[in-house]
Amino acid sequence: MPETNIDAGPNFFWVRDDWRKELNLQEPQTLDDVENIVRAFMKYKGADGLMADTSLTTGTGFSSEYLLNLYFAANNTYPKQWIERNGTYQYDSINEGAKTTLSHLHDLYKEGVLDKNFLLRTSNDIAREIIYGRCGAIFGPWWVPNNPLVDAIKKDSSAKWKPYLIKTNGNSTTYHSVIPSSKFVVVRKGYKHPEVIFKIISVIFDYLRYDHKNVEDVNRYYEINVDPTARPIAINVDYQDALKRSYYNISKILNGASSKNIMAIDVPYATACKNYLANKKENSAENWAAYASRIEALGLLEKNNVVKVKSGYFSTTATMNKKMWKLKELESDAYLQIISGSKPVSYFDDFVKQWKEEGGDTITQEVNNEIRNKEKASET
């Protein structure tokens, strides 16, 4: 049973909006605005610089927290992705736009706008900084209200986190497409009841009979924000445009429509959103998280110009199997050393040369051959 990955869109800039308003800062629209807000938070609120995960950008295509994809996208670059340029697919980590981005990130690191300790931080460490009010701005996907922001609200109910969609290309926000599937549920041969997998998936994700005696148990599971990894089967099976569907389904219910014929997963979130809107000042952090993620963030995706760039290849070639691990290590080391100043920006050219010589050119050829062969096969 494959997991069907949804289109999660680009990362948002999540901001302590109570701090922003207190300091009379304009709502962020560009990366320049992002940096000005971080500078102000550092100066007047004693906050850390912009937090970043050392992976810097997404690999398989998933949006994740604390990543700097938007900076690369602003230079028309999508690291770790195979992007078509001038008729052939290229590994975008070696694109000249990456060099430009790394140079700028080095400047931010040197200034402290990019957290000086990001090379040493773990995700748990970053979450602690957020929860205890030492961080007021992060990049993250639509779901970060569920983790870690919900815990920040529990710790300090006066914290008002708000998502903003940052423009990377004129009036649009660009991001790359995701791998269609990356996880699978397998059942051993001879297992007595393999159909139970499909039944569980149907209960969690499909349309649900709302007169069933156990429906409240399932709905409550979502309403109290149980972590998805606690599910009996820890995969998502949904439409690619599930976020759009969820936003419109919940919006319909909030506007008075019946919850019948609405996907089961959306109904408890709609209830949580209703509860939040009924009393914003005295409400649970979980209700806020449902509204901030499912209405505020997803609403921004629907109401703004969001452009998806196609990632052309997600499989594995013969040379990738042997050498890609080493090339990824080379890439990570080069990126982090340039940002931190251990290597000059010009080292990027040495990295690209080494990447090509140590298997990158061969992999590029293999990727393009596979893509061409698939295109030819689809034409016959």
Describe the predicted segments one by one.
Residues P79-E96, N169-T174, R231-I253, R372-T380:
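Short, solvent-exposed loop/beta-turn-alpha elements that line the ligand-binding surface or hinge
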Residues P148-N169:
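Ligand-binding "clamshell"
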Residues G170-S177, V185-R188:
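Substrate-binding rim/cap in mid-to-C-terminal beta-strand-loop elements of soluble/periplasmic
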Residues D206-D333, S342:
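Conserved small-residue motifs centered on glycine
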